[in-house]
Amino acid sequence: MSTNEGSLWGGRFADGPSDALAALSKSTHFDWALAPYDIKASKAHARVLHRAGLLTDEQRDGLLAGLDSLGSDVADGSFEPLPTDEDVHGALERGLIDRVGPDLGGRLRAGRSRNDQVATLFRMWLRDAVRRVADGCLEVVNALAVQAAAHPTAIMPGKTHLQAAQPILLAHHLLAHAHPLLRDVDRLADFDDRTAVSPYGSGALAGSSLGLDPDAIAEDLGFASAADNSVDATASRDFAAEAAFVFAQIGVDLSRLAEDIILWSSTEFGYVTLHDAWSTGSSIMPQKKNPDIAELARGKSGRLIGNLTGLLATLKAQPLAYNRDLQEDKEPVFDSVAQLELLLPAMAGLVGTLTFDEERMAELAPAGYTLATDIAEWLVRQGVPFRIAHEAAGAAVKVAEGRGVGLDALTDDEFASINPALTPDVREVLTVEGSVNARNARGGTAPTQVAKQLGVVRKAMEELRIRLS
């Protein structure tokens, strides 16, 4: 049997828990990450107890000094949980009692439960974590923006269904990857607004009868307000699920960028060369330069999605209020943050060091008859109904395919035989430069519009940094 040493309960039990139960209940191997937040919250709790008349000045000061000492020892690693400690809360109470004695150290637990305590600490940890993740996302966005600025007129094949579609600017494509990541950071900023609500003072579920001030401790801990419902505050983990969703969405957005890089770096595409420092080789094939960062981004996106799915499954059938199932809420979120903190700097470095082959992309831009839409839209500008224009452009592609040439190689007579409206003037749109320049509406791929898009991305980056600072 376990001795139950290091637990915060046991008075009504005749004996300690079984060894198997103690092993199952133990959470210090992951919740120790909350230790700095636990100490900070304990200091705020001591001040609230003092204001409520439950601690003398001397007792408050003694607890604060003991917590300062304990915090320093936690920070430098000289105080760590013991195998007998059930969780971070019990370990830290043991450490505090070692420093200030059982009479004074035992007073701190008044008016709080592990239920409101851990709900608060998890929110505090996440509010810091999302800022780190947001910073990492913005570094990837910045790398995309820098590459876009370095290639303002480079033209590449735009694709749908992974088939040649229309010519676009490389910068346009790169910025298309920046926008989803900016939305992810915007979601993280919104998430912080909803998470800045403190459960402290909710007790186990019903609130406190000791005259404590939840708003005071909320302000002390940097929250915008205290919770309005103590049952909801202790039992709800929608904030964790929301964070896990945004982390998974970031993974998905990075995976799509990674997939492009993997394709572009292949011999068949040949758009980019990977920097040596951001790629790996093969143990048997000496010629290989592998896009491992991009491949790991694809792989880790599945892990992030799994963390979200697992957390939602844990939360889906719990009656109010707190249940021990919620011990399982932290590991998937902690893991998602850890994976993104590994992945985001690597993706920023990979993107920032890509070398693009502009000639190769320009050579492939008209392949696959990507200017067919330009013929159809040119006819529309001449007054031809789009249905007829679409058919005529398709017929031009069929003739060119039959001859094994590009659209620009068709003769004037061939164009005229397809549709009399296809005069020699149609050749003004039969260049990739003309096609790109013509798409000058907001959001389009014309250089003037892409330059504006780059400005929008840079402005959004700065605004988001300010929101999250």
Swiss-Prot record:
Pathway(s) annotated for this protein in UniProt: Amino-acid biosynthesis; L-arginine biosynthesis; L-arginine from L-ornithine and carbamoyl phosphate: step 3/3
Pfam families: ASL_C2, Lyase_1
Gene Ontology biological process terms in this record: arginine biosynthetic process via ornithine; L-arginine biosynthetic process
Subcellular location: Cytoplasm
Cellular component terms per the entry's GO annotation: cytosol
Gene Ontology molecular function: argininosuccinate lyase activity
Keywords: Amino-acid biosynthesis, Arginine biosynthesis, Cytoplasm, Lyase
Keyword Cytoplasm: yes
Gene3D superfamilies: Fumarase/aspartase (C-terminal domain) (1.10.40.30), Fumarase/aspartase (Central domain) (1.20.200.10), Fumarase/aspartase (N-terminal domain) (1.10.275.10)
Reactions it catalyzes: 2-(N(omega)-L-arginino)succinate = fumarate + L-arginine
E.C. numbers: 4.3.2.1
Family according to the record: Belongs to the lyase 1 family. Argininosuccinate lyase subfamily.
Annotated protein name in UniProt: Argininosuccinate lyase
Organism field: Mycolicibacterium smegmatis (strain ATCC 700084 / mc(2)155) (Mycobacterium smegmatis)
Lineage, top ranks: Bacteria, Bacillati, Actinomycetota, Actinomycetes, Mycobacteriales
